[in-house]
UniProtKB/Swiss-Prot annotation:
Major localisation: cytoplasm
Gene Ontology annotations of biological process type: chromosome condensation
Lineage: superkingdom: Archaea
HAMAP family hit by this protein: AlbA
Compartments where found: Cytoplasm; Chromosome
InterPro entries: Alba-like_dom_sf (IPR036882), DNA/RNA-bd_Alba (IPR013795), DNA/RNA-bd_Alba-like (IPR002775)
Keywords: Acetylation, Chromosome, Cytoplasm, DNA condensation, DNA-binding
Family note: Belongs to the histone-like Alba family.
Name of the protein in question: DNA/RNA-binding protein Alba
Keyword Cytoplasm: yes
Length: 92
């Protein structure tokens, strides 16, 4: 069984990522990393808070938060800098 799982947060509703996170913890994963870029950052934060406070209260804690910036190719081949975040959730 894997001890860590990464979930990439994107365009789907936040509840999809909440369900994926809860299912990972129920399957025995000890650590889940939520990764998001740009506009999806707020969705990743909402996912982490919903899992911690509503779905698994007292069982999951936010272990670490990393704020990053990624270089991506924009339109016309120009390089852009996009904000990114990694939120680490662990079983308490």
């Amino acid at each position: 069984m894997a001890t860590e799982q990464t979930i990439l947060v994107g365009k789907k509703p936040a509840t999809n990522y909440v369900i994926a996170t809860v299912m990972a913890f129920n399957a025995g994963v000890k650590r889940v990393v939520l990764k998001a870029r740009g506009a999806a950052i707020s969705k990743a934060v909402s996912t982490a808070v919903m899992v911690r406070d509503r779905f698994l209260p007292g069982k999951v804690q936010i272990k670490d938060i990393k704020v990053l910036s990624d270089k991506v190719q924009g339109q016309g081949g120009r390089e852009r800098t996009v904000a990114a975040v990694e939120i680490v959730l662990e079983m308490a």
